[in-house]
C-alpha cells in the first residue's frame, strides 16, 4: 500500500493545556508534553474526511504523528474547575434521542443524586505551551492511489495555510483552545528547548487507527514508552511493536 511521502508540520500554541494522565483521571494531572492522540486531533480538526454510512464513518486516511518538538519549557499551573459527574452520551444514544426511540436525559448541573451534578476538581495543567508537530497521511485500503494521496495532502496544506478548521483544535480539554500555523519545509524554525525526560508509559491513542470503519465504539487504549531527548519526542508508527495495544475484542 502506498503512503504519503510528504510530511506536514504545524506550530501550535495556547495559553493552557491538559493532557490528562489516565492513572490520575479524577484529579486531572497533565503529562509534561502533548500526547500523540491530542496532536492527531489537531490535524483531524483541520482536515479529516471519509464516507458516511449508517454503520459509521469510513475514513479515507488517518494521521500518523511522527515527531513532537517542545518550543517552550513545560510549566505547570494549579486550577480548580467545575465539572459534571455525568458522562456525555455517545453518537448512538444521541441518534436514538433524535429518532424518538428514547427519551432524552439531560446532564444536570445540580441534582439531589450524589452521583450526578457538578463538582469542583483540581487540575494540574500546563501554561503557555508551544509545540512543533510533524505528521503524515496514512491512506486506508482503496484510497491509496498516488493521485488520491496528493489530493489529501494538497487539501490539508491549503486549509492549514488559510487557518481553516472544521472545529476549534484544543489542547486536551475543549476549554483550552489551540492555535496553529502551517510551516513550510526549509523555512527558519525555532529550535526545541533543552528538555530531557523519560516520561514512561504514555497514552498513544484511544482509537484503533487500523480500523477501516469508525464507529461509536469502546475505547481502544494504546501506550508507548515515551522519552523526550533535547526537547524532541519521537513517535513510533501505530503498527510498531513499541506501541502496546490490546488484542482486538479485548477492549
Residue ranges of predicted features:
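Intrinsically disordered, low-complexity acidic/polar segments
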Residues: 19, 77, 140-144
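Internal, well-folded beta-alpha domain core
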Residues: 83-251
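N-terminal ordered "arm"
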Residues: 2-53
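Beta-strand elements of well-folded, non-transmembrane domains
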Residues: 12-16, 72, 133-141
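Short, charge-patterned binding micro-sites
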Residues: 62-80
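Short, well-structured alpha-helical interface segments that form or flank functional binding sites
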Residues: 34-41, 60-63, 128
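Solvent-exposed loop and beta-edge segments used for protein-protein assembly and interaction
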Residues: 2-4, 62, 123-129
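Acidic, Ser/Thr- and Gly-enriched intrinsically disordered low-complexity segments
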Residues: 31, 42-61, 78-92
